[in-house]
Amino acid sequence: MRNCRTSTNEIDLYVQWTEIARLTHLQIAFPYFGDSFLCECKNYGEPVGVTYVGKFCSLLLCSNVSLGVMISWNGVTGRGKWDASKGLIKKFALKENRYIVVLDKNDLKQLSRKETNIFSLIGNKVQALKLDIDYSTYLKSHPAESEFARSGEK
């Protein structure tokens, strides 16, 4: 559906599997899409700022979907991985277990040249985001853990 509205927001695209796709379990092959996802299109001359990314985060929450695709020719703001809009996208993923992927001019050019397809592109970006926020490799056992474990047995 295009440009549908909630009571407070407009949704550019609400994408869901067709009945045939659901009956053939196509969504199992692409689990990162869930049953549906939102798509936000921003045609700005500059990267999308943190305010609009924050509004998109809010829209994902109130729509109860776990994937959002933001299409922005110039991407989103942030000099480093954890700065501005890029940082908000990662923090949102960590806290809410919901993912926003950004498709920029490079991605759109790849799609138009048929160097990739939309399923692979979005899937790779979701996977990259998940790996980027995974902190488990940095967790090491603390020497006092065994003491806590023993005191819990009493």
Which residues fall in each region the model found?
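Mixed-charge (Asp/Glu-Lys/Arg
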Residues: 1-154
